[in-house]
């Protein structure tokens, strides 16, 4: 059975050359998403995730909420295995696909078609499987002749269309999305939302970080609120 389990997970990272009090004050002021720990010489330690535990199983669709810098993106990347935990245990049972920052995994000098193949192969597809997915991705993203052009010529909305189409063509057991719906025109957002509904209906675990609470209410059945590296499960009634 698909599952994603965090047991007392902490993720800390050092900030080097933090030799001045002004830098320390700046770190606090911009809110890193965690806590600023004690400095060791010229190193300041930031605890982005602080001893958090939860369990996700098949059927869980989780909305992550919290202010900018609360730790949502850090949590998603730790879920995906991009960031290693400093301590604690993470158990992942199931394949993972992500939609994070614009252009992640893409080569801007390659065409849309070439990037589709590149991303699908990076996600573990065979060449034959990747080629079989191209027509459906092409139809969904609606980029037409732009797919033969370098991705560096794309707008941010076009790039997100392509990334989203590739990620959701995979049908992974676990899908992690960071603020995906904030980019793109209204028509594509509506189309993407419908695709997500269809995906969730037949999926295992879905985790979505967003400031759009109305969209979280439509797509999710659990709410995690992050604040200064800590996690709290909230009732859906807060939306």
Curated annotation (Swiss-Prot):
GO terms for molecular function: ABC-type transporter activity; ATP binding; ATP hydrolysis activity. GO terms for biological process: polysaccharide transport. PROSITE patterns: ABC_TRANSPORTER_2. It holds the Pfam family ABC_tran. It is found in: Cell inner membrane. It is a peripheral membrane protein. Its main location: membrane. InterPro entries: AAA+_ATPase, ABC_transporter-like_ATP-bd, ABC_transpr_TagH-like, Bact_Polysacc_Export_ATP-bd, P-loop_NTPase. SMART domains: AAA. Gene3D superfamilies: P-loop containing nucleotide triphosphate hydrolases (3.40.50.300). ATP binds at residues 66-73. Keywords: ATP-binding, Cell inner membrane, Cell membrane, Membrane, Nucleotide-binding, Polysaccharide transport, Sugar transport, Transport. One of its GO terms (cellular component) is plasma membrane. The keyword Cell membrane applies. Residues 28-239 form the ABC transporter domain. Belongs to the ABC transporter superfamily. May form an ATP-driven O-antigen export apparatus, in association with RfbD. This is O-antigen export system ATP-binding protein RfbE. It comes from Yersinia enterocolitica.
């Amino acid at each position: 059975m698909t599952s994603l389990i965090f047991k007392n997970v902490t993720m800390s990272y050092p900030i080097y050359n933090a030799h001045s009090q002004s830098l320390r004050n700046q770190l606090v002021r911009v809110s890193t998403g965690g806590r600023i720990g004690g400095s060791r010489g010229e190193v300041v330690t930031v605890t982005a995730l602080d001893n958090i535990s939860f369990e996700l199983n098949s059927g869980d669709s989780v909305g992550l909420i919290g202010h900018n810098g609360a730790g949502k993106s850090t949590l998603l990347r730790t879920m995906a295995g991009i960031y290693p935990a400093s301590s604690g245990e993470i158990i992942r049972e199931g394949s993972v696909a992500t939609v994070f920052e614009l252009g992640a995994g893409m080569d801007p000098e390659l065409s849309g078609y070439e990037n589709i193949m590149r991303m699908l192969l990076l996600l573990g597809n065979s060449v034959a499987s990747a080629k079989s997915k191209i027509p459906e991705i092409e139809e969904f993203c609606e980029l037409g002749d732009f797919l033969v052009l370098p991705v560096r010529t794309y707008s941010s909305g076009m790039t997100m269309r392509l990334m989203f189409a590739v990620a959701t063509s995979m049908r992974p057991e676990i899908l992690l999305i960071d603020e995906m719906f904030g980019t793109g025109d209204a028509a594509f957002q509506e189309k993407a939302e419908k695709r997500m509904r269809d995906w969730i209906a037949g999926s295992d675990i879905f985790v979505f970080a967003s400031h759009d609470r109305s969209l979280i209410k439509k797509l999710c059945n659990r709410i995690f609120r992050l604040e200064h590296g800590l996690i709290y499960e909230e009732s859906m009634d807060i939306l």
